[in-house]
Amino acid sequence: MSVYEKVFDKIKENNIDVYPPNVHKGKVNSNYIVLLDGGRTRASTFTSQTVLLDVLVYVPAHRFTDLDLLSSKVKNIVDGLYPLIIPTGNETAAFYDESIEGWMKSVEYRYTVQGNE
């Protein structure tokens, strides 16, 4: 099982709606998470790579105060997978998207893979 799948399953086990990218469509009618591959980097000539994983937190327009609550809840859940996955400390500011009538912020995590995993 991949790290992505472990994080996805851990969030889902805690009764939070979670989706892979480009699956949830339309307006934000309830709180949910999108789990997104944030890319990879390789240091120098080493074969290991650092993989970034973005947790995108969405809440409806009228539930702005839920944004930080849901974000904190998800961070506590994902932090339970440490040291498999580690927070980078990067979080975006809240952003309102009129096209989906919802608020979003993201929390970034990282993990390391060997070779071309």
Where are the predicted features?
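Charged, amphipathic alpha-helical segments and their flanking helix caps
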Residues: M1-N22, L36-E117
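Short, well-ordered secondary-structure micro-motifs within conserved domains or adaptor modules
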Residues: K27-L36
